C-alpha cells in the first residue's frame, strides 16, 4: 500500500506526470492509503497528472484529499474499491484508459456501476445533466454547476450523501 507521495511533490520541479510505481521494494502496490496524494503543503500550484498502475485494487477514502494540483487521474482496470468522498478538494479529470468493469466515467461523471452511485463530477461535467443514478455520493458534485440556476435530480435517485450538493 502506497502511503505517502510527498517526496515527489517536495522537489524543485514537480513532474508533469506522476506515475505511481507498480512495485515498491519488490512488493506490488495494491492500494493507495490515506493522504498518499495530498498536495496541500506541496506542489505550489504546479499542475500534474497521476497514473495509478494496473494491479492497484483499492483506494482509501482520503488518498486524494486536497490533491488540488492534479489535472488528470488515470485509474487501472483492476480498481474495485473506490469509496465515496475520495475526491474532496480535487478538480481533476478522471479516466480509465484500459476500461474498468465496476466504474465508468462519462461526460465527467464517475459512477460506481455496482451501486449506481455518482462518486465524482469532474470540471468537464459542468452544465451536463446529472446522470440516472440511485445515489449521489458524499461530496459528489463539488465541481459540478448546472446549466442555468435549476438543479434537476434524476427520477432514479433514492439517496443523497453528505455534502453531495455543496458544489
Explain the meaning of each model-derived region.
Residues 13-30, 42-58, 66-81, 90-108, ...:
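Structural signature of tandem-repeat unit edges
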Amino acid at each position: 500500500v502506497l502511503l505517502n507521495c510527498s517526496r515527489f511533490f517536495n522537489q524543485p520541479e514537480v513532474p508533469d506526470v506522476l506515475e505511481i510505481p507498480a512495485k515498491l521494494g519488490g512488493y506490488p502496490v495494491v492500494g493507495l492509503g490515506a493522504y498518499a496524494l495530498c498536495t496541500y503543503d506541496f506542489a505550489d500550484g504546479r499542475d500534474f497528472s497521476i497514473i495509478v498502475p494496473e494491479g492497484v485494487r483499492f483506494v482509501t477514502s482520503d488518498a486524494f484529499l486536497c490533491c488540488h494540483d492534479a489535472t488528470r487521474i488515470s485509474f487501472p482496470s483492476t480498481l474495485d474499491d473506490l469509496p465515496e468522498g475520495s475526491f474532496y478538494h480535487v478538480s481533476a479529470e478522471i479516466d480509465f484508459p484500459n476500461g474498468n468493469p465496476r466504474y465508468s466515467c462519462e461526460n465527467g461523471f464517475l459512477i460506481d456501476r455496482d451501486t449506481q452511485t455518482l462518486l465524482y463530477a469532474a470540471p468537464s461535467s459542468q452544465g451536463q445533466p446529472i446522470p440516472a443514478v440511485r445515489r449521489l455520493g458524499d461530496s459528489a458534485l463539488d465541481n459540478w454547476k448546472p446549466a442555468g440556476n435549476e438543479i434537476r435530480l434524476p427520477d432514479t435517485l433514492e439517496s443523497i450523501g453528505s455534502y453531495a450538493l455543496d458544489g
